[in-house]
Amino acid sequence: MSRLAGLFVQLRDAGRAALIPFMTAGDPSLTATVPLMHALVAAGADAIELGMPFSDPMADGPSIQRASERALARGVKLRMVLEWVREFRTTNSHTPVILMGYLNPVEAMGITSFAEAAATAGVDGVILVDLTPEEGRGEAVVLRQRGIDPIFLLAPTSGPERVATVRSMGSGFVYYVSLRGITGAAQADWAEVLERVQHLHRQLGLPVAIGFGIRDAATVARVATGADAVVVGSALVDQLAACATDQEAIAAAIRFVEPLAQAVRSTERRGA
C-alpha cells in the first residue's frame, strides 16, 4: 500500500481529515526547505504539498506567485526540488510528499525522466495544475507505473464528464478547488462546498482534499467535517515570506500549523 493510501485508511479509521500544508520549494531560502518540511511534520502535518516553482503560475494568487519568483531568482530548478525530497526521505519515510506545479518544467525534463527521478527521491503524488485529465492520460500512466499518484483537480464548474475522467485517470486523492479563481482568494460558501464534496465522494471512490481560501483554524475545522484532507497554502506562504532567517521561518511554520493540526484532530469527519 502506498504512503498516501495508507494515510487515508489510517485517518478514515480515526474519523478525521488530513492536514496538508503547502510550501514553495526554495522559499524563503534554499537552506530552509528541508528543515521546514520536518517542522511541518513536527507541527502536525499529515502530508506535505511542495510547490515546484514556475515562472507563470496562472492558477496561483499573489502570495504563491511571489514565492515562486523568489525561489526562481535563487536559482531553484526542478532537480533541486527532487533532491530536497530525497534529503527529507533520509530521516522521514512515512509522511507523504505531493509535488504541485505546472507541466512546462516537467515536459522540459521529460515525463519519464521526471517520474523516475521523483520515484527515486520518494515523491508520492504529483499535481500538475495545467494538465487536464483528458490531456494527461499518458503522463498519468507513466507516473502510476512508477508508484506515483497522478492527482487531478476538480472545481465547482466541473461537469459529469470531467468527474468521470478524473475517476478513471486519477489516484491518491482528488483536489477540489473550493473557489472559482486563484489561490489565496477570500472566502467560499463552505456549506455549498461541503455539499458538493459529499456528492463527489459518492461518484469518485477516491479521497477528496479541499483547497483554496483556507486560512485559519476555524475554517480548517469547518472544512474537516466533510473533506478527507484540508490544504492550506497561501496563508502559510505569507507567514514564511515575512521571515528574515531560516530559524524564524521554522518557528513561524510551527506556530502557524499547530492550531490547524489541532483543528483537524478535534473535528470528527461526517461519514468517516
Swiss-Prot record:
InterPro entries: Aldolase_TIM, RibuloseP-bd_barrel, Trp_synthase_alpha_AS, Trp_synthase_suA
Family as reported in the entry's similarity comment: Belongs to the TrpA family.
Catalytic activity: (1S,2R)-1-C-(indol-3-yl)glycerol 3-phosphate + L-serine = D-glyceraldehyde 3-phosphate + L-tryptophan + H2O
Pathway assigned in UniProt: Amino-acid biosynthesis; L-tryptophan biosynthesis; L-tryptophan from chorismate: step 5/5
GO cellular component, one term: cytosol
Record keywords, A-Z: Amino-acid biosynthesis, Aromatic amino acid biosynthesis, Lyase, Tryptophan biosynthesis
Gene Ontology molecular functions: tryptophan synthase activity
Domain of life: Bacteria
HAMAP family: Trp_synth_alpha
Keyword field contains Lyase: yes
Subunit annotation: Tetramer of two alpha and two beta chains.
Job of this protein: The alpha subunit is responsible for the aldol cleavage of indoleglycerol phosphate to indole and glyceraldehyde 3-phosphate.
E.C. code: 4.2.1.20
Protein's name in the database: Tryptophan synthase alpha chain
Organism: Acidithiobacillus ferrooxidans (strain ATCC 23270 / DSM 14882 / CIP 104768 / NCIMB 8455)
Enzyme class name: lyase
Active site: E49 (proton acceptor), D60 (proton acceptor)
Pfam families in UniProt: Trp_syntA (PF00290)
